């Protein structure tokens, strides 16, 4: 298997190297090509360690909210202490951070850097290759895959938009069903600052989060789980005018919808513990042939 993978890597590198030369003669070497080459060169490190049913090789696809959650919430450190190898994928230009906390210098090339529901659905619709030739194949080098959209997604302006979100996540779930050797953890999108939303849009954001947590979405799909980031960050007092919006004690100054350090310090350990519990439970389920 290793020999076959080596020759596949060499072949893929040759093709991408030729493409790079063409780009150099024309528009210049694009960062996407550089990242793809680096991902191919490093893929063995990701695919060989923490695999074979251990479900301890974890990657988290996110943007800035996830970055602060990881850094300020001690997510990587907590998972490392429990024996997990935690990678995370930020914007493409930042790329992937490895389990030691070091930037790798490459990304998996998320199409258009789009982690909104439509972008995630497009990512999951990519063909799966043994090598990380696209973003989906890159994420699938890891056994536990977390992903989230950022807070603008919580500005759900109509019931029709809410239903479209659900359809995209159902399409993703169909793909997840095809890969029981992987565990997928969905994070509900974080809530918005009250200045950036309306009560109606916020209520739909809560409804979307609740749906992702529901039996309707999860029952019968044992390798799919949901962490309620929205619920962890949103005001839940039904009598508050800011219900379903970013909690006052979790806000930064002004109108910024990024949760503050207090929020990240409180929620980060909860996320790490959820990953550990969920991975352990699924590992046992797979081992028992359930």
What annotation goes with each model-predicted range?
Residues 1-16:
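N-terminal Sec-pathway targeting helices
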Residues 17-37:
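Membrane-interface motif at the C-terminal end of an N-terminal transmembrane signal
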Residues 31-95:
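Serine-esterase "nucleophile elbow" of acetyl-processing enzymes
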Residues 122-131, 160-172, 201-214:
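Well-ordered, non-membrane alpha-helical segments in soluble/globular domains
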């Amino acid at each position: 298997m290793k020999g076959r993978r080596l020759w596949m890597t060499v072949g893929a590198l040759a093709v991408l190297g030729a493409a790079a030369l063409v780009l150099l003669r024309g528009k210049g070497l694009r960062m996407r090509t550089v990242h793809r080459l680096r991902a191919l060169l490093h893929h063995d490190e990701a695919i060989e360690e923490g695999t074979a049913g251990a479900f301890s090789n974890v990657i988290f696809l996110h943007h800035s909210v996830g970055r602060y959650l990881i850094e300020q919430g001690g997510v990587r450190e907590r998972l490392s202490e429990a024996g997990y190898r935690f990678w995370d994928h930020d914007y493409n230009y930042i790329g992937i951070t490895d389990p030691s906390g070091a930037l790798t210098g490459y990304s998996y090339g998320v199409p258009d850097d789009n982690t909104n529901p439509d972008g995630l659905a497009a990512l999951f619709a990519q063909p799966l290759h043994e090598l990380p030739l696209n973003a989906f194949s890159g994420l699938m080098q890891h056994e536990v895959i977390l992903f989230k959209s950022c807070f603008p997604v919580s500005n759900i302006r109509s019931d029709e938009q809410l239903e479209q979100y659900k359809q995209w996540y159902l399409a993703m779930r169909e793909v997840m069903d095809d890969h029981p050797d992987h565990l997928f953890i969905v994070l509900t999108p974080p809530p918005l600052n009250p200045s950036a939303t309306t009560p109606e849009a916020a209520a739909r954001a809560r409804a979307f989060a609740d749906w992702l947590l529901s039996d309707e979405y999860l029952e019968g799909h044992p390798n799919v789980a949901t962490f309620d980031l929205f619920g962890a960050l949103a005001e839940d007092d039904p009598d508050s005018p800011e219900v379903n919006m970013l909690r006052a004690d979790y806000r930064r100054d002004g109108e910024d919808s990024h949760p503050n350090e207090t929020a990240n310090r409180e929620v980060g350990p909860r996320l790490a513990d959820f990953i550990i519990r969920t991975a352990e439970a699924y590992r046992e389920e797979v081992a028992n042939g359930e």
